[in-house]
Amino acid sequence: MREANVYSEIVPHTVTAADIAAKRPAGIILSGGPSSVYEEGAPRLDEGIFELGVPVLGICYGFQVMAVALGGEVAKTGHREYGSTAVRVSAGARGGAGFLLDGQPGDQTVWMSHGDSVAKAPEGFDVLASTDDTPIAAFANDGRKLYGVQWHPEVKHSEHGQAVLENFLHRAAGIPADWNSGNVIADQVAAIRAQVGSGRVLCALSGGVDSAVAAALVHKAIGDQLVCVFVDHGLLRRDEARQVQEDYVSATGVRLITVDAEEQFLAALESVSDPEAKRKIIGREFIRVFERAQADLVAEAASEGDPIRFLVQGTLYPDVVESGGGAGTANIKSHHNVSGLPEDLQFELVEPLCTLFKDEVRAIGRELGLPEVIVGRQPFPGPGLGIRIVGDVTRERLDLLRDADAIVRAELTAAGLDSEIWQCPVVLLADVRSVGVQGDGRTYGHPIVLRPVSSEDAMTADWTRLPYHLLAKISNRITNEVEGVNRVVLDVTSKPPGTIEWE
């Protein structure tokens, strides 16, 4: 939707028609899902949504829910369709008889993922498309502006999927393509000013894109009311602390205070290997450091009559969704931006990016004039290398992982692939010892995992097919140059089922 320059929000299936009406949406899209409409406890929706007079598009499971709700039938046909599937669009549908598939080729490849199928369309609906195993792959009632497709138009594997979405958004729903990063900046600047007023604000700079753009956005809104604090927790990659202090300050001119808290974080993480526990400890210690760091700032602000009450966080939309953002969603894992905060948190949160995806954050950063070295930086988690060590975190393990990570980043840059991949986490399997032969003797070292992934918004991702010669060079350098490592492996898992980070 946002690629079509239309703003959108995600709400749970339990939302009522009245709640939807109160939001005054221009269109509604019902998403796909893994359930069967006939399963006990399968997600349902308030059928009054179809009576609001708002255009609705059902996708995959949403298509089937719509069919059943409006009097159609869904059945287990015995035929399942997963992956690339050939679909045939009717001549009328592609020739201007309706909005949804108008202008599309008669034969095209789409991405399917379903076991059940719509066996009978609701009364008043025209069948628009079919496959060999699915006679009703799309339907429409243009008079009521209700539409559905069995395939997934939102994924790139559906050749003309974006055109389907844009036909629904712009033609059926009549939504103009006028949402862009400039709109977001103006809206957020106004929202920040309304929330903060003349108050003083703290922001943690982690070295990543999210916190950098969040801080720049807040600084644009309130200027010198913002003070940025860079907590060097000792979990950063090589040279990252220096880059934060030099690159960001020179680009924005914001006031930056650096706190060296490495010893505190390492002490708190001692002998802790559980991933969730590490995330929560890191989140907790971040806040504790802030509470101490603010002492001088509070005294300064108090002398000026402006207490510090606000904390900026670079929370993104995927962080909220993955942390279980509503009924019917699963908590995939806690995020440092939305979990692990102590109950006695003394700040009111300012989260200017919490409705945005990573690619949108980068666009806003460029619009704000941040240098490419900052906005083009590969994503790096707030808990840093602490969650890229599978096992407990020690100074020695951090140094080992930094060396391996530096080699990977240098080789990707030299190969000109920085813009081709989303990110490449380098993971140390610290709790695993692998037997090897180096020199004339047997060794027991730790494996290093390479996790190159391609994505646009971090909600889904696929592993990046790096050239074999590059993988060989990276492996040879790591096993020869990083003491304690005798094996390099490649993670070839997509998301889903795996998340991008190992922990």
UniProtKB/Swiss-Prot annotation:
Domain GMPS ATP-PPase: from-to ranges: 179-377
Active site per database record: C60, H152, E154
Gene3D superfamilies, alphabetized: 3.30.300.10, 3.40.50.880, HUPs
Record's keyword annotation contains Ligase: yes
Top-level division of the source organism's lineage: Bacteria
GO MF: ATP binding; GMP synthase activity
UniProt pathway annotation: Purine metabolism; GMP biosynthesis; GMP from XMP (L-Gln route): step 1/1
CDD domains recorded: GATase1_GMP_Synthase (cd01742), GMP_synthase_C (cd01997)
Catalytic activity: XMP + L-glutamine + ATP + H2O = GMP + L-glutamate + AMP + diphosphate + 2 H(+)
Keyword terms: ATP-binding, Glutamine amidotransferase, GMP biosynthesis, Ligase, Nucleotide-binding, Purine biosynthesis
Protein residues bound to ATP: S206, G207, G208, V209, D210, S211, A212
GO cellular component: cytosol
This enzyme's EC code(s): 6.3.5.2
Domain Glutamine amidotransferase type-1, first and last residues per copy: 1-178
A Pfam family hit: NAD_synthase
The keyword Ligase is assigned to this record: yes
UniProt cross-references to HAMAP family, sorted A to Z: GMP_synthase (MF_00344)
Function: Catalyzes the synthesis of GMP from XMP.
Oligomer status and interactors: Homodimer.
Name of the featured protein: GMP synthase [glutamine-hydrolyzing]
